[in-house]
């Protein structure tokens, strides 16, 4: 049995740190829907709903300060992470949520319908087969094993002056070695998560 009061309290405490108090109800609805679907469809390896609050919701919201532009794509979004929390926090931005897994896209379409989230577009396709009419201002992912792979498979998606955001744990020293583009690394803290977290911001411009 889920203690909604406890979950709401955890959410409110963390959201206060992000100064995002107003989105608690919608995030809770998303979390409960994710937990319900996860029991049948195995959308995420995390089963404990309290852990989902920090490792899914708060970790997603922590990269908000570095999002650029209005046209965003979350590649390998899975059950909408980080895309859904970001879209809830930024209803004025447009998010494409890309994944090749049918059950995850079905879940995202249900989230869009039930929660009436108008600024997301779930798309089921492999990233190499997706060719939009325009590039994205920000390409986000936490699905790739390395930064080099992320750039290789999403190069065609980023706008000329666009940005990649890669969510990482420890500082990715070795992953940064083969990167030809200019970049910076921002360390951040997540309520409820111990240990290092960092976001790699890679510009779509080569180093001189």
UniProtKB/Swiss-Prot annotation:
Record: residues binding S-adenosyl-L-methionine: 76, 81, 127-128, 142
Leader sequence segment: none
InterPro entries named in the record: rRNA_ssu_MeTfrase_G, SAM-dependent_MTases_sf
Catalytic activity of the protein: guanosine(527) in 16S rRNA + S-adenosyl-L-methionine = N(7)-methylguanosine(527) in 16S rRNA + S-adenosyl-L-homocysteine
Cited CDD domains: AdoMet_MTases (cd02440)
Entry EC no(s): 2.1.1.170
Annotated keywords: Cytoplasm, Methyltransferase, rRNA processing, S-adenosyl-L-methionine, Transferase
Top-level taxon: Bacteria
GO molecular function term, any single one: rRNA (guanine-N7-)-methyltransferase activity
The protein's name in its UniProt record: Ribosomal RNA small subunit methyltransferase G
Species whose genome carries this gene: Legionella pneumophila subsp. pneumophila (strain Philadelphia 1 / ATCC 33152 / DSM 7513)
Gene: rsmG
